[in-house]
Regions:
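Conserved catalytic alpha/beta core of Sir2/sirtuin-type deacylases, generalized to analogous enzyme cores
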Residues: 1-278
Length: 278
């Protein structure tokens, strides 16, 4: 890494009064989680779906639950257990400790539904999950039932050869019909967003206090660029963004610094430079 880039990173850290952590699927790669780079990448983990040529957008939508709930819950049940068993990598703790050194602390904006930030000890009141959480459930037909969202305590058993749930399907605690993950899916008009709108309000309140945020973005893809757009919005042309991405680290001129590397390696580099100025 050249000295000019390192000097920029030190200057960003030294002037920051709050840490805005933004994270996409690439944040979990160093913990061993897949980032599903296209259908081919997903089919490596779910060969049963590959045999049927069922892509991510075809399984990750409410229609999949309506047409074949066992298969849809086979996919999401497997992911649920995988996330429960995953240990967050060191980078999570390093980011948390860095944020705690700044005047206004940290806030997390993530498109990940895996709950890894909570698992790593981050304050749940300082996390905005913009696409929801797999660790919560809602009714498939909330307009006819209830907008309630509740903890996902199911213990799924999956037949991986067919990507099918073989344990009982989760039921809505109000009407007894099928329950689904509290996640924003494709072509999804019934996702109950209100718990996450509350998270968003807390984030907006925090941003009003912070005058010079340091934005560290990790593993945010370009296919669904929600996280990337948000990072650039917060940076707001102030060169406050550090974008970490092994494949798509490109950053707009005047927006900040790009690090073409994996999440953990990039975080460790930033924290090393932080020790020199904090």
């Amino acid at each position: 890494m050249n000295e000019v880039t390192l000097n920029k990173i030190r200057a960003l850290i030294a002037s920051a009064d709050g840490l805005m952590i933004t994270a996409g699927a690439g944040m979990g790669v160093d913990s061993g989680l897949p980032d599903f780079r296209g259908n081919e990448g997903m089919w490596e983990y779910y060969p049963a779906l590959g045999k049927l040529r069922i892509g991510f957008s075809s399984i990750a939508n409410p229609q999949a639950f309506a047409e074949n709930p066992e298969r849809a819950w086979g996919f999401y049940g497997h992911r649920l257990m995988m996330y429960r068993q995953t240990v967050p990598h060191l980078g999570f703790r390093l980011l948390k400790e860095l944020g705690e050194k700044l005047k206004h602390g940290y806030f997390v904006f993530t498109s990940n539904v895996d709950g890894q930030f909570q698992k790593a000890g981050f304050d749940p009141e300082k996390i905005y999950e913009c696409h929801g959480s797999i660790h919560a459930l809602q009714c498939m037909t909330p307009d006819d039932c209830s907008p309630s969202v509740w903890p996902n305590n199911m213990q799924p058993k999956i037949d991986n050869d067919f990507c099918e749930l073989v344990s009982p399907l989760p039921k809505c605690k109000h009407c007894g019909e099928l329950a689904r993950p509290s996640i924003l899916m494709f072509n999804d008009w019934h996702w109950q967003e209100w718990p996450y709108q509350q998270q968003n309000q807390r984030l907006n309140d925090w941003l009003k206090q912070v005058k010079s945020p340091l934005v560290i973005e990790i593993g945010a893809g370009v296919a669904i660029p929600t996280v990337r757009y948000f990072s650039e919005e917060v940076a707001n042309g102030g060169e406050r963004l550090i974008r970490i991405n092994p494949a798509n680290a490109t950053i707009r001129l005047g927006c900040g610094v790009s690090l073409t590397m994996g999440g953990l390696a990039g975080i460790e580099m930033i924290v090393k430079e932080a020790l020199a100025v904090l």
